[in-house]
Design a protein with these regions (language model features):
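Juxtamembrane transmembrane-helix boundary motif
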Residues: 2-6, 25-117, 166-185
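Transmembrane helix-bundle signature of multi-pass membrane transporters/permeases
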Residues: 10-18, 49, 146-157
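Small-residue-rich packing faces within the transmembrane alpha-helices of Major Facilitator Superfamily
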Residues: 18-22, 77, 81-84, 154-158
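Helix-loop-helix "hairpin" substructures at the membrane interface of multi-pass membrane proteins
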Residues: 99-131, 137, 151-157
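C-terminal transmembrane helix-loop-helix hairpin of multi-pass membrane proteins
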Residues: 143, 151, 158, 162, ...
C-alpha cells in the first residue's frame, strides 16, 4: 500500500473505531442488552463530540508553538502520563472514594466536553478515562459505564470522521483498504 500521511492513517483509524463502536452500540440495542442511560449518555456524547473538535484545535495550536512535532508529542505524552497516573490511583482506591450522582444537563455537557477534549488532544479513544469518569461522576457499574463509554466514543468519532472529510485530502485512500479496516475492525 505504500506510506500514507499521518492524517490519512488517523482518518482510517477513526473509521475503524467508528465502525466498531457503531456495531457494539447497535448490537446491544438489537439484543435488548443495552444499559446506555440516554438521559445522561446523550448530553455526555454531544459534549464529547464538541470537546473533541476543541481538542484537535488545541493540539494543532500546541504543535504550532514548537519547531518540531516531537516536542508537541512530548507535551501530549506528559499529559497522558498524568491522566493515566490519576486513572491508576483512582482505580486502586475506588472502593474508598465516595462517588457522585450527577444528573444536571449542563454538568453532563461540560463533563462530556472535557472527556472529548482530552481524548482528542491525546489522540486516544478515551476508554479507561471515560470509565473512571463515569464511575466517579455517575456511579455507574462496569457494564453500564462500558456501554455509555462506547456511546460517547461513537459520537466523538462521527464528529472526528466528519471533520476529516472536509479537512483532509482523502484521494490517497484505497477503497479496498478502507473497507478492509472497517470490516475487520
Amino acid at each position: 500500500f505504500g506510506a500514507l500521511d499521518v492524517s490519512i492513517i488517523n482518518f482510517l483509524s477513526g473509521c475503524t473505531v467508528l465502525s466498531m463502536t457503531m456495531y457494539s452500540v447497535i448490537k446491544a440495542k438489537i439484543a435488548k442488552d443495552s444499559v446506555i442511560n440516554m438521559k445522561l449518555g446523550t448530553p455526555l456524547a454531544i459534549g464529547a463530540a464538541i470537546g473533541g473538535l476543541f481538542g484537535k484545535e488545541l493540539f494543532s495550536y500546541v504543535e504550532s508553538l514548537f519547531d518540531t512535532p516531537n516536542t508537541a508529542g512530548a507535551v501530549q505524552a506528559f499529559v497522558l502520563m498524568l491522566i493515566t497516573l490519576g486513572t491508576l490511583i483512582y482505580t486502586i482506591n475506588k472502593n474508598k472514594v465516595h462517588t457522585l450522582h450527577v444528573t444536571n444537563l449542563l454538568a453532563c455537557l461540560i463533563i462530556g466536553f472535557i472527556l472529548g477534549g482530552f481524548s482528542s488532544f491525546l489522540g486516544i479513544g478515551g476508554g479507561p478515562i471515560n470509565l473512571v469518569v463515569l464511575y466517579f461522576f455517575f456511579t455507574m457499574g462496569t457494564k453500564e459505564a462500558a456501554q455509555n463509554s462506547l456511546y460517547i466514543i461513537l459520537f466523538s468519532q462521527i464528529t472526528s470522521v466528519g471533520r476529516s472529510l472536509f479537512t483532509t485530502d482523502l484521494s490517497q485512500i484505497s477503497i479496498v483498504l478502507l473497507i478492509g479496516m472497517i470490516a475487520c475492525g
